[in-house]
């Protein structure tokens, strides 16, 4: 085939030289057409010309896609999560990992609160490293998320979440004391009640409370339109710090459980958002999830 194409092309070039025509692509093709070819030669020439005149291919869509989310950008909840504003308070064993995982999902904005600085002892169960020691946890986590998730829409506040702090529709906490949980929950509830009963705004509110020990955890989640869950949470789960079960100082936290509870909490958040994206079957957003590492037993209550 190459010999035939070469011969045809040579004939065309000779005709062009004799006629002293300008070497434009259109005149070149007209000269080739003037050559008497057999059907087989015409077919071969057409294939050769097509190969020579291929247009530059259209850029792959992946060129314009954020490569840091490309492995899950096809999820039904992907775009909706990027519209969410999330408040996360308490950046210890629970909050550090939750913040990292949320950063990977890239919500519209992530607001984080914690007044504490990183200490060496935190490395026994929290996400922080040696270079973070001495820094505020909120600043250290923000820098980590920027580095590991290429996510910059994070507001890092080196303060406690107080009664006068601003609430958002979605609030997640990982506190180690009941007083802070109570304040955080009350602010979220006030925001929920500021919306008309039965409104879509209420339905789009979510509260997640994570509680962690060395080898067990509990996750409580309340949707804005679930009054039953609010009552149960207030009556059964907002007890005082004096009533909270004490733990042995050297057996308070492990990294693998901190990582695990964070994954479950973010899973609940993802399921909640997915339910606004028209899933074939609604996803579960359980009120209560508990896990015991010694038996590997998981308990779920809706």
Each model region followed by its residue ranges:
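Glycine-rich phosphate/adenylate-binding loop
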Residues: 2-60, 80, 166-170, 174-302
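Glycine-rich dinucleotide-binding loop and its adjacent helix/turn
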Residues: 55-79
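Glycine-rich adenosine-cofactor-binding loop
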Residues: 82-106, 111-117
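Conserved active-site and cofactor/substrate-binding residues in soluble primary-metabolism enzymes
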Residues: 89, 97, 133-136, 140, ...
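Short His-Asn-centered micro-motif
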Residues: 89-92, 113, 157-159, 173-176, ...
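Conserved beta-strand segments of alpha/beta enzyme cores
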Residues: 109, 153-155, 206
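Glycine-rich phosphate-binding loop and adjoining beta1-alpha1-beta2 segment
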Residues: 112-150
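A structured beta-alpha segment of the ubiquitous adenosine-cofactor-binding alpha/beta core
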Residues: 136-168, 175-179
